[in-house]
Amino acid sequence: MKTFFHIILSPLRWLAQLLGLLRTLLVNLILIFFLAALFMLTFSNDKVTVRDNTVLVLTLSGQIVEEQKIADPLTGALNSLGRISRLADETLLQDVVDGIRAGAADPRISCLLLDLKDLDQAGLDQLQIIARELLKFRSSGKKVIAAEDYYRQHSYYLAAHADEVYLNPMGLVDLHGFGIYRLHFKEALERLGVNYHIFRVGDYKSAVEPFSRDSVSDQTREQNRTLVHDLWQLYTDDISRERGLQPRTLELYTNHVVAQLAAAGGDPATLAWQTGLIDGLKTRQEISEYLITLSSPDTEQDFSQISLADYLRSDSIPYPEKKRKDSIAIIIAEGPILGGYQPSGAIGADSIGEQIKKARLDPDVKGLVLRINSGGGSAFASELIRQELLTFKKSGKPLVVSMGSVAASGGYWIATPADEIWAAPATLTGSIGIFAAIPTFEESLARLGVYNDGVGSTALSGSTDLTRPINPQLAQALQLTLERGYRRFLEVVAAGRGLEMSQVSQAAEGRVFTAAQARDLGLVDKIGHLDEAVAAAASRAGLTDYSVQTITRSDSMVNSILEMLRENGARMLISQSGWARLQEILSPFKQSLTGLALFDDPQRLYARSELILESR
């Protein structure tokens, strides 16, 4: 018998020893990892020296964001060190602004070179902010030069604001217009046996259409056509002004490309030059030789240059700005609105609530600018944030909202308490409406021969079980709650904006508006960017001499170390075009399905707008 048990237990003992060995190895690897991180933290912050007559290379990579995500710092750090990710997943907008401004005032910087080949995504509002800084840089008497193998839409917008724009002789300028396209899953869900129960208020509330339709509704099509037309007009007007083009030039270039290309002998680069989109055709070597004439040669074959990342670590950047006794605080609200504490890249009701409270209790903070770039999310979380902002206002400090590319639905809900709302020229806002969505999988399971049955103590027992058909009483209760939530949304807007309910109703039903339309409807006060909103807050606070500080969320030291590793590792990477292409292909699926993971509202009510503008 002992021999029998020995035979049975021996593999288990061996397995336990193996697990213990693996656990010890893992602990040691983590220890080495953190020691390396501490070493990098200690020695990687040395100031970079800038040589005289140096070209500042403004490299924009990944997505332009206003708050960098640290949602999974360990993965980010390992990806960067393992050369899995791109050169950088994100570029912080404020870093770009700081770098350009410092370069304009730095006598050692001779000119600025735009490096846009790895720029994946940016809102038109963000592009406009960077473009304004480029124009200010040019006004200092220094050149801005753009030179690429090819230009996509968002990268060309910035290039058009340069003094000189060059293109590789084998390149092209890809301008094709804006669009709003979404995948629709109704037929797929039916084939899978998934029953999606949709509840919504507002004919224009289109966030759930992909799960209930196979095509865009007439109302949504009408609305989106107006939005893309107005934003494209804004885009083309800016480019035509900076490039000195006739208004019809870009219309011919995009809508009659076949005839235009045929006239240019089928050569896209020649077409771009003949149209006036670029100033000349130059190879990479010719660009390098040209830049040597504008700077000190670093070697016989290259020019003296410094990257934006290194320049931000140099002694030229007065960053962060020294806090004065009187300051205007900025809080970034970017991403989906969710309950609880959320990492950077999402707006958590509790996490941003702490930031607002910090601004309220700080005696040196005399005013607050809430920078919103969000399509909304949980209605309950949005209301919690609004309540915290109302508490802030009781302190007597002014509250100003600055809207980014999108401030819609729940993003507009949290803007309503503001004393003053500024929307950027390219802002999309409104979408006053709410919805609820509950999928059930009883048919999916039945096809597999799996059924759910039993008894409950009340009529609502088991009503939240997604493997059962939706309870009729739950559906009716949810619709009543939804209608009450919609009325509450209208009341919040009316109270915050000083409008009659009839006026709000005309701007509701889930409609989305451009900044100009929203201003005409009384939903926003003025059109301008973040700088103007900060100045407005200072004016309301009676300040003329003040500093600006950004109140960030409190991250743990572990997260900070891991994020530092990610940033330092990213600088060692080369662009992974294959990986980037895969991400681009999967992007529509990610954008369409991400919303499913964000449904965390306790009442299942969502004030969210799915505005995905295809602008690349």
Language model region names:
Residues R51, H161-D163, L192, G276, ...:
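Short, structured coil segments at secondary-structure junctions
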Residues Y150, H256-D267, V406-A408, G510-R511:
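Short helix-initiation/N-cap motifs at beta->coil->alpha
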Residues Y166-L167, I278-R284, A423, V524-L530:
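Short acidic-hydrophobic, aromatic-tinged amphipathic segments that line or gate anion-handling sites
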Residues P343-L598, L605, I612-R616:
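C-terminal structured domain segments across diverse proteins
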Residues T54-R182, Y319-S444:
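Cleft-lining beta-strand/loop regions that shape enzyme active-site pockets
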Residues M1-L87, Q94-V97, P169-M170, G179-A269, ...:
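Intrinsically disordered, low-complexity segments enriched in small/flexible residues
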Residues K143-V144, T275-I278, L521-V524:
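Short active-site oxyanion
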